Every structure is written in structure tokens, then in C-alpha cells.
Amino acid sequence: MSIILSLETSCDESAAALVSNEKGKIDLLANEIASQIDEHANWGGVVPEIASRRHLENLPFLIEEVFAKSTLQIKDIDAVAATVTPGLAGSLLVGSITARTLANLHQIPFLGIHHLEGHLSSIYLSENHPKPPFLVLLVSGGHTELIKVDVKHKYQRLGRSHDDAAGEAFDKVARLLGLSYPGGPAIQKIAKSGDPKKFLFPKGRVSKPEGGFYPYDFSFSGLKTAVFRQIEKIRSENKKLPIEDIAASFEYIVAEVLVERSFKCALDQGLNSLVLVGGVAANVRLREMMLAKASKNSIDITLAPMEFCTDNAAMIGAAALLRLSSEGFKSSMELGVSARWPLEKSDSLYDPIPPF
């Protein structure tokens, strides 16, 4: 059995967790998160400098808390893991330096984890999870991707957003409607009392240079523009803005596009298992539409547990345990951080000569 202390500081959530594996099962021993949402809401989005400063303040207390709740001590852990890419560089540095310092002091391995691999690994924190190969729809504030997962951490990106990520579109449309940050929960709340078929917003497509469309790719910038124009039209007519209906119609079309292209990709690729992870995976309408579509197709659907959809350290620990237990992976103490790094190159985070 291995026990890992994991840290997550890629954006605006400071998090620490202790995870272990026994008999092939990942157990969460302790999990703590300090959210900065209220502070960043004053600015309408994440302020990188504020985020990194809060990580510096929060992380020591979170680490103390997970050890206190688990009754473990630092001498009991076998490795330390932290998110090193992608994310806000200043925020990533806080978690990475903390993890490497602890690993050096106690002479145990350090694992630098790709943030998206963490999201993919969140499904292993539930009782039932699929075995590779399977297709993942990873949908969050910064990413909207369709990823094929094969054995031994082999990833192939089959679809992506060419502009705004879905979560980013939620934030921008919420701002247009005068709703609070973050936009996802705000739109979901008000959309409950709206008509999702009131406005027929467009399903963005991405054109190929040679003609036609990329079948599994996404584009949400045109949808955002369509919402803006609809709002302007209604205001120009001096009518009351039907915020609930606009929110519901926007939420519905985003969910429909995500579901349609995910299932098309899975069926075309001959994959009978589809997984939904990421912050936007907490959206109730999206989860319901995924389950409804799955019931009409010969595809098994796995939804990330609600508590592990948004950024957390438990999923980083799960990813680290899978790396450590399968191949004995560990990262160089010289590994730095990077704001961007392809998931397909995540194996390079464990090279003797680090990629950054």
C-alpha cells in the first residue's frame, strides 16, 4: 500500500489531500479545499497575483489539516505530488515548490501531475469506474476536449474547442446577463425557471480548410455572440429581458452540443464507454442529458462524482497513485511548471531530464 500527499494550486482553489491504494482500490483519507471564489468574484474572474498569494497563505494550513484529520504523520507517506501544468504559472509554483521541498526533506519521491490527467483520474475516486479503452469528455473553465484513454496512460485527443472552453462561455454569458461569477452555477440556478426552447441559439461548428466540418470539435464564441445580439435586440425593443429563458436556452444548447458530439465520437471510434469529468461536469442538465442519451445507445456512461468535478487535490492524488503503482513513475526534483503542456506528452513529466 502507498500513501501520497497531493497538492492542487493550478488556478484559484488551494487544495491538499491524502490518498492511498490497497487491493487496487484508491481510498481518500483526507481532503481539504480553500476556495477563493468570493474574492475573485469582486473582479469578475480570477486575478493571477491574488490567486498565488492566497495559495501561499492557505497551503500550509491545508496540509496540517489533512494530516490532523487522517491521524497520519509526514513520516507515513510514500510520495508527494503536485499539479505542475497547465495553469497559472505563479499558482502552480506554490504547489510545486511546496511538494518538492517536502519530498527533498523527507527523501521520498516527487510526482509532477498534469492537471487534465488529474481530472481524468477523478473517476477512480468512485466505486465503479471503467477500464480502458474509453472516451472522456473533459469540460471545464479552461478546456473542452474529447480524449481517448488507452492502457498505460496513453492519451489521444480526438476533439477540442477552437476558441472558448464551455466553462469560459458560461462565465461570459453570465456576465452579459448580469449574473455573478462563476457563471456555471449562476446560470444553472436561474435556468431552472426558464424555457430551454425559447431561443434557438446556434450550434457552433469548426470548418475544415478543404471543406466540411471537424466532427468532434467545438466552438462557443459564436454562441456567445448570438446571446449578446439577442440581448441587444430585446433591449432595443424596450422589452423586459427574459433572463431565465435566455439562460435556460443557452445552457440547453451547450449541453446538447457536448452530448451529441461526445456520443458521435464514441460510436465512430467503436468505444462503448464514455466518461464525463471537469468542472462543467457538475452541471445537472448536462448530466441528465448524458444519462438520457446513454440509455438510448449501447454505451456505458460514467459521471465524475459531483464533489470531484471542480479542482481538488484528491484527483491529483489518484493520478499520482496510478503512476506510482503501475510503473513506479517519479519526477525529477528539477521539474518546473508550465502554463501549457499537451496531455499527450504527460509521460515526459517523469523523464530524468525534465521538459521544463
Swiss-Prot record:
CDD domains in the record: ASKHA_NBD_TsaD_bac (cd24133)
Cellular location(s): Cytoplasm
Enzyme nomenclature, EC number: 2.3.1.234
Pfam families, A to Z: TsaD
MF term (GO), any: iron ion binding
Ion transport is among the record's keywords: no
Annotated positions binding Fe cation: H115, H119, D311
Cofactor binding description: Binds 1 Fe(2+) ion per subunit.
Spans traversing the lipid bilayer: none
Catalytic activity: L-threonylcarbamoyladenylate + adenosine(37) in tRNA = N(6)-L-threonylcarbamoyladenosine(37) in tRNA + AMP + H(+)
A GO term from the CC aspect: cytoplasm
Binding annotation for substrate: L138, V139, S140, G141, G142, D171, G184, N283
UniProt entry keywords in alphabetical sequence: Acyltransferase, Cytoplasm, Iron, Metal-binding, Transferase, tRNA processing
Cofactor(s) in the UniProt record: Fe(2+)
Gene3D superfamilies: 3.30.420.40
Any one GO biological process: tRNA threonylcarbamoyladenosine modification
Family: Belongs to the KAE1 / TsaD family.
Role summary: Required for the formation of a threonylcarbamoyl group on adenosine at position 37 (t(6)A37) in tRNAs that read codons beginning with adenine. Is involved in the transfer of the threonylcarbamoyl moiety of threonylcarbamoyl-AMP (TC-AMP) to the N6 group of A37, together with TsaE and TsaB. TsaD likely plays a direct catalytic role in this reaction.
Protein's UniProt name: tRNA N6-adenosine threonylcarbamoyltransferase
Species name: Prochlorococcus marinus (strain NATL1A)
Taxonomic path: Bacteria, Bacillati, Cyanobacteriota, Cyanophyceae, Synechococcales
Gene: tsaD
